[in-house]
């Protein structure tokens, strides 16, 4: 009898310890999720990054609904994306705040759902987007409210918002409608950093600005000003943009087919052009790195934007640089992911879905066609393999199942692919 009591006691003790350990494991798992920070996420290939706009109509007046955003988030999550970049928190454009709501709802529905956000705060100069001449030496009075809203959302969603990006291409001088001087970006970055120190923002929230490589010192000397040096010191990391696609028109020296390659098969000419495109992006990345190190600074540098359009009736189309099609997009996407994942660089690939508001009066304008998915939810060539793997099974966009463009017919796709111009042809145009 006593022996039986002892056995029961021992078994009960084992059960209690087991339950206790299980509870500890569950608590530990929960704590790990809560404690994920920007430092953990950035540069981690387990957290693929992407630029995201969920707009489906020709005007941003038509805001995507929460259910539509949740559709998109499920699609992106299925392909391994866990870090989104948004661009503004303007009062009339609740897209970003709705994305945060949608993520929170999905997390409540599924404890394993994981998605984080680099929240953009839009920065303008005085008179931007008006009929008055932009004053690039004075900032817009709207900037203060934009920063306040971004900070408020970071506090409301500390489990989701891990980064605030002050401005989008807000310092680069070709943004003639709205660019500001580096001192404006520095002012707001310092303000947010001060809020962190005062305990008014999460201490692990990272602050940056997302801008062209040249704005981060990788280009001409006109950008090498004291306020940029201070900005490099002030941010937690650098978020730089690089676009070989656009430079196939504006700086095409790398793009043309060399004389020595003229007798190669067209497929080889295209593949080698895309290898040069990757090297172009890497060179711009290295130029920002070199500038940063010349200041005695050593911080992470990640790619806040890069992408490749699939339709263009302008500079990049059949009568231009002939850079535009899904095949080239596929080669670029794969090579960028491969390089950045191996190098420990986050790449906010631009972008998730086509958005037709970007060039609303020109349906075939390249800005409308940077997505990895069409508006209808068709997967473009770069991610056909994911469709084959079945990761989108059961998911829809606008009632459409996720299928391949061109009905998955690569031969049909290749009919739309053009070889880049020769070096001689490019030089003759310049």
What are these regions (language model features)?
Residues 15-18:
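C-terminal motif of bacterial Sec signal peptides marking the signal peptidase cleavage site
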Residues 140, 171-303, 309, 313:
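Noncatalytic carbohydrate-binding groove/subsite architecture in carbohydrate-active enzymes
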Residues 84, 164, 238, 303-305, ...:
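Conserved, mostly hydrophobic/aromatic
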Residues 34, 89, 94-205, 303:
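Substrate-binding cleft of extracellular glycoside hydrolase catalytic domains
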Residues 25-72, 82:
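Boundary/entry segment of secreted carbohydrate-active catalytic domains
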Residues 68-93:
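Catalytic domains of carbohydrate-active enzymes, especially glycoside hydrolases
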Residues 61-64, 85-99, 125-128, 140-143, ...:
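Acidic-and-aromatic substrate-binding clefts and catalytic sites of carbohydrate-active enzymes
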Residues 28-39, 45, 314-335, 339-430:
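Aromatic-rich peripheral "rim/lid" segments of glycoside hydrolase catalytic domains that contact
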């Amino acid at each position: 009898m006593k022996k039986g009591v002892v056995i029961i006691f021992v078994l009960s003790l084992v059960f209690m310890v087991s339950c206790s350990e299980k509870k500890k494991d569950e608590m530990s798992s929960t704590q790990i999720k809560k404690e994920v920070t920007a430092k953990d996420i950035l540069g981690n290939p387990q957290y693929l990054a992407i630029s995201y706009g969920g707009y489906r109509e020709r005007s941003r007046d038509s805001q995507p609904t929460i259910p539509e955003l949740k559709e998109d988030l499920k699609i992106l999550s299925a392909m391994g994306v866990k870090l989104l970049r948004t661009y503004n928190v303007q009062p009339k454009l609740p897209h970003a705040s709705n994305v945060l709501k949608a993520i929170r709802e999905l997390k409540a529905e599924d404890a394993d759902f994981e998605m984080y956000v680099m929240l953009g705060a839009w920065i303008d100069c005085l008179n931007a987007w008006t009929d008055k001449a932009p004053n690039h030496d004075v900032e817009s009075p709207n900037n203060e409210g934009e920063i306040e809203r971004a900070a408020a959302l970071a506090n409301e969603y500390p489990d989701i918002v891990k980064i605030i990006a002050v401005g989008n291409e807000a310092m680069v001088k070709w943004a003639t409608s709205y660019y500001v001087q580096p001192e404006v970006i520095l002012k707001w970055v310092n303000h947010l950093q001060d809020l962190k120190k005062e305990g008014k923002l999460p201490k692990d929230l990272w602050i940056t600005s997302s801008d062209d490589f040249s704005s981060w010192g990788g280009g001409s000397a006109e950008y090498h000003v004291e306020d940029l040096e201070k900005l490099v010191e002030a941010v937690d990391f650098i978020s730089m943009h690089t676009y070989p696609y656009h430079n196939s028109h504006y700086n095409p020296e790398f793009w043309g087919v060399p004389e020595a390659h003229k007798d190669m098969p067209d497929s080889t000419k295209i593949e080698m052009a895309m290898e040069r495109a990757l090297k172009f992006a890497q060179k711009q990345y290295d130029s920002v790195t070199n500038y940063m190190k010349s200041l005695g600074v050593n911080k992470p540098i990640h790619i806040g934007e890069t992408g490749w359009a699939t339709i263009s009736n302008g500079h990049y189309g059949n009568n231009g640089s002939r850079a535009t099609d899904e095949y080239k997009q596929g080669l670029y996407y794969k090579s960028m992911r491969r390089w950045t994942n191996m190098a420990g660089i986050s790449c906010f690939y631009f972008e998730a879905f086509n958005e037709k508001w970007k060039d609303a009066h020109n349906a075939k304008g390249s800005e409308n066609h940077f997505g990895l998915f069409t508006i209808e939810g068709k997967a473009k060539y770069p991610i056909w393999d994911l469709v084959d793997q079945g990761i989108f099974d059961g998911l829809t966009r606008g009632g459409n199942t996720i299928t391949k463009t061109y009905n998955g017919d690569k031969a049909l796709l290749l009919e739309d692919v053009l070889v880049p111009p020769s070096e001689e042809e490019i030089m003759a145009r310049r």
